[in-house]
Amino acid sequence: MSKLVILAVLVLLPLVTAEHGRDEQAMQPEKKTMWTLWSLTRRGECDGKKDCITNDDCTGCLCSDFGSYRKCA
């Protein structure tokens, strides 16, 4: 009987974890969409177009790395 219970757990465990993984993957596009909507609402020097060296060069945002450039975002 105990072997049957262990076998059932071993069979059902991957199914439960696979469903959990699908839920996490389904939520990622929403996060990306929200990030895109948020970045589109940025105006002024915080839109990623103004060059900067330190955070003091940006008003209301941070100086961030974009590839080999630093921009206010």
Curated annotation (Swiss-Prot):
Propeptide: 19-41
Gene Ontology cellular-component terms listed: extracellular region
Disulphides: C46-C61, C52-C63, C58-C72
Principal location: secreted
The keyword Secreted appears for this protein: yes
Signal sequence region: 1-18
Tissue expression as described in the entry: Expressed by the venom duct.
Keyword Signal assigned: yes
Location(s) in or outside the cell: Secreted
Alphabetic keyword roster: Cleavage on pair of basic residues, Disulfide bond, Neurotoxin, Secreted, Signal, Toxin
Any one Gene Ontology molecular-function term assigned to this protein's record: toxin activity
Domain notes: The cysteine framework is IX (C-C-C-C-C-C).
Protein name per the record: Conotoxin Cl9.2
Species assigned in the record: Californiconus californicus
